[in-house]
């Protein structure tokens, strides 16, 4: 079994001009979260062809997602090509998503990495970096993510200093941060990353704002002392990129803020958009003032009562 937490990007640049997919990606800052993707892998037939593996995917509401396996079959083909898997046996692979797709929680990257590392547990071949590089390339090939694989590789609260795949041109750092947080999203909404990163106007706005934000935080140690800078720059990024001005996001953020005010927690939390969904994360304003279990439960129940979806999770650091 393999479990990989999701990832939230708080601000970023779009850097996909490189000829090689392994050098494309993004720079920026993000947070790894505990909820993500769980994978169970077992042998189906010891003499069977790996291409005949059974792959079942379940969404966060435990409903089977049909016709969603091509992504993972591409991964298995690439692992065989790289000699990290043999052409037999065939497998039974069950993939369970713990959060919705297309809401900025990196379910595609987490799913790929979870399946890749489950295959590595079985084959006991290659380095972790090799598997992450393959996952990054598939993400770029499908336009489903820029820096999620590199962010997950770093763990915790991460900064991506150079775009690309881990172990190729990509460079990222992460620090541990034991904090409960709350994810909130608009249930009917979903947005594919490519809508923004393939649009020249959005790409320019996002990258300009992302460069400004990153330049303000990249110098100096990467640790808890940067928390205020991260909160400040993620707020500025949302305004400068104009992502927070889109009507759906603007209305969504207003609704979230009014609920936070109604339970009188506005002085203890900061609301930040998750790139690029109609979703946000509630982060502690100060790391020495952790939200209590009661406060977390109150927030979650109020969001759900008001027609939003919410999940209590935590910042995650995987060694």
Predicted feature locations:
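Solvent-exposed alpha-helices and their adjacent loops that cap or buttress functional pockets
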Residues: 2-3, 21-22, 30-33, 142-144, ...
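Glycine-rich, charge-dense phosphate/pyrophosphate-binding loop(s)
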Residues: 223-319
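DPxDG-like acidic metal-binding loop motif
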Residues: 105-128
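Alpha/beta catalytic cores of group-transfer enzymes, especially the acyltransferase/condensing modules
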Residues: 129-173
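Acyltransferase
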Residues: 174-241, 245
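ATP-binding N-lobe of GHMP and related small-molecule kinases
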Residues: 1-101, 124, 313-319
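Short beta-strand-to-loop capping motifs
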Residues: 43, 186, 282-286
């Amino acid at each position: 079994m393999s479990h990989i937490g999701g990832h939230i990007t708080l601000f970023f640049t779009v850097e996909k001009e490189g000829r090689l997919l392994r050098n494309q990606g993004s720079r920026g800052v993000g947070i790894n979260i505990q909820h993500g993707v769980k994978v169970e892998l077992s042998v189906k037939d010891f003499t069977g062809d790996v291409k005949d593996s059974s792959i079942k995917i379940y969404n966060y509401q435990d409903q089977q997602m049909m016709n969603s396996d091509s992504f993972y079959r591409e991964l298995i083909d690439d692992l065989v090509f790289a000699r990290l898997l043999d052409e037999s046996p065939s497998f039974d692979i069950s993939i369970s998503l713990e959060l919705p797709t297309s809401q900025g929680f990196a379910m595609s990257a987490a799913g790929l990495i979870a399946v890749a590392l489950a295959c590595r547990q079985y084959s006991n071949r290659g380095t972790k970096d090799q598997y992450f590089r393959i996952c990054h390339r598939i993400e770029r090939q499908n336009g489903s993510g820029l820096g999620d694989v590199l962010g997950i590789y770093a763990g915790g609260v991460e900064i991506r200093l150079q775009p690309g795949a881990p172990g190729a041109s990509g460079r990222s750092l992460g620090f541990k941060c034991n904090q409960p947080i709350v994810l909130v999203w608009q249930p009917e909404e979903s947005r594919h990353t490519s809508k923004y990163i393939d649009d020249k106007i959005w790409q320019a706005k996002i990258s300009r704002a992302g460069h400004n934000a990153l330049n303000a935080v990249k110098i100096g140690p990467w640790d808890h002392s940067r928390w205020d800078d991260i909160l400040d720059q993620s707020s500025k990024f949302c305004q400068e990129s104009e992502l927070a001005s889109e009507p759906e996001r603007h209305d969504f953020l207003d609704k979230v803020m009014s609920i936070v005010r109604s339970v009188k927690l506005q002085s203890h939390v900061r609301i930040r958009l998750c790139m690029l969904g109609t979703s946000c994360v509630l982060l502690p304003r100060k790391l020495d003032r952790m939200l209590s279990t009661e406060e977390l439960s109150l927030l979650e129940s109020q969001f759900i009562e008001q027609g939003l979806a919410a999940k209590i999770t935590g910042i995650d650091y995987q060694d």
